[in-house]
């Protein structure tokens, strides 16, 4: 079974996120959408509500599960024994940012690969 992790703050959950989840769920046997929690920031929407909204939005995708994590993403990947990380990108500048994040993650944990998935151009701003 091939699985992946799609992390994000999802604050708020957008149609762009759901589009990426839908597309990813068609490519992988299991997708774990992980709400990343930054304990140093208070989000616009409480974490519990984000999880609830994601669960509702992901009902059409039986191979998608929702999780949350309040530590480093590399630690999550290691603990869950996941090997594929999905990141959505909307622009060339985001590709550069993701490359830098990927390099940092590789220093922390070499056991996973990051795949960049371009966003749907019609949903880039939503």
List PLM regions with ranges.
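Nucleotidyltransferase catalytic core that binds NTPs
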Residues: 1-126
């Amino acid at each position: 079974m091939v699985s992946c992790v799609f992390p994000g703050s999802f604050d708020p959950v957008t149609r762009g996120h759901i589009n990426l989840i839908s597309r990813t769920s068609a490519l992988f046997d299991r997708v774990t959408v992980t709400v990343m929690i930054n304990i140093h920031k208070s989000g616009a929407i409480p974490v519990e509500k984000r999880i609830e909204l994601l669960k509702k939005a992901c009902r059409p995708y039986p191979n998608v599960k929702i999780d949350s994590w309040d530590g480093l993403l590399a630690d999550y990947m290691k603990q869950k024994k996941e090997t594929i990380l999905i990141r959505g990108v909307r622009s060339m500048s985001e590709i550069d940012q993701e490359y830098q994040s990927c390099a940092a993650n590789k220093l922390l944990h070499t056991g996973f690969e990051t795949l960049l998935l371009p966003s749907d151009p019609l949903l880039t701003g939503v």
